[in-house]
Design a protein with these regions (language model features):
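A short, conserved, highly charged catalytic patch centered on acidic carboxylates
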Residues: 2, 11-154, 164-210
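Phosphate/pyrophosphate-binding active-site loops
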Residues: 155, 159
C-alpha cells in the first residue's frame, strides 16, 4: 500500500494511511504539532446543556455502540442539533468538495460559520486515522477559493464518545492537535462550549436559545 496520497485519492484514503500525521502534513507543505491547547469556551448560558446531557446518559445503557451509525445518530447528532439551535449556523452533512486531485472527498459535517469549521467522524474508534483525515480536510479548506479570509480554521475529530480538536493557522501553515480528549457524555458541556465559541462570536448567537 502506498504511503502517500495519489491523484484521485479522497479524504477517506488519508484515514487509511499508516503514516505519522507530521509526515502527512509535510506532503502538502504544512507543519503539524500536538500539544495541550487552552481552547476558549463560551461562558454564557446554553439552556439545552443539562437536558441533552441527561438524555444521552439515559439512553446509553440501552444502546449497543458497536456500529458507527449508532454512534453518529445517538452521540453526534444531538450535538449537531444543539449547535444549530444555538447558532443558526448552516451545517451540511456528507458535504463533497474538490480542491485538487489530492484534496477532495466528503466532509462529514461542514459548518458554514464565519470561519469555516469541520467535524470529521473517526470510523471504528480510530482517532489516528480520523486525525489524518482531518488534516487533509483542513488543508483543503485552507486552499479552497470559497473559504473566507481568516487567520485560522477550526476542526474536530470524534468517535462519538471521544472528541479531539485541532486548529490550522493559515499564515504559518501550522496545524495544531489538542492533546486533550473530551468524552461524551461526561464532558458534554465542555465540548458544546468549545464548539459554540469556535463557530460564532457572542453577538451572533441566537439569544432566544441561550
Amino acid at each position: 500500500m502506498s504511503q502517500t496520497l495519489e491523484p484521485e485519492d479522497t479524504f477517506s484514503r488519508s484515514f487509511d494511511l499508516k503514516i505519522p500525521a507530521q509526515n502527512l502534513a509535510q506532503e502538502f507543505g504544512y507543519n503539524f504539532e500536538s500539544q495541550s491547547l487552552q481552547l476558549p469556551k463560551y461562558k454564557g448560558e446554553l439552556n439545552y446543556i443539562q437536558q441533552t446531557q441527561e438524555q444521552i446518559q439515559e439512553i446509553l445503557p440501552h444502546l449497543s455502540l458497536d456500529s458507527d451509525r449508532t454512534k453518529r445518530e445517538f452521540l453526534v447528532a444531538p450535538i449537531i442539533r444543539d449547535l444549530i439551535c444555538y447558532t443558526h449556523t448552516q451545517i451540511r452533512i456528507e458535504y463533497k468538495i474538490k480542491v485538487s486531485d489530492r484534496l477532495q472527498g466528503i466532509i462529514n459535517y461542514f459548518i458554514e460559520s464565519p470561519n469555516f469549521s469541520i467535524i470529521s467522524f473517526a470510523k471504528g474508534e480510530n482517532l489516528e486515522g480520523g486525525t489524518n483525515q482531518l488534516i487533509t480536510q483542513l488543508i483543503a479548506l485552507d486552499q479552497w477559493d470559497n473559504t473566507p479570509a481568516s487567520d485560522r480554521l477550526f476542526g474536530a475529530v470524534t468517535t462519538g464518545s471521544v472528541w479531539q480538536f485541532g486548529l490550522l493557522h493559515r499564515q504559518t501553515k501550522l496545524i495544531q492537535q489538542d492533546l486533550n480528549l473530551y468524552r461524551v457524555p461526561n464532558d458534554f458541556e465542555a465540548v458544546m462550549r468549545i464548539l459554540v465559541q469556535a463557530l460564532v462570536s457572542e453577538n451572533q448567537l441566537n439569544t432566544s436559545n441561550i
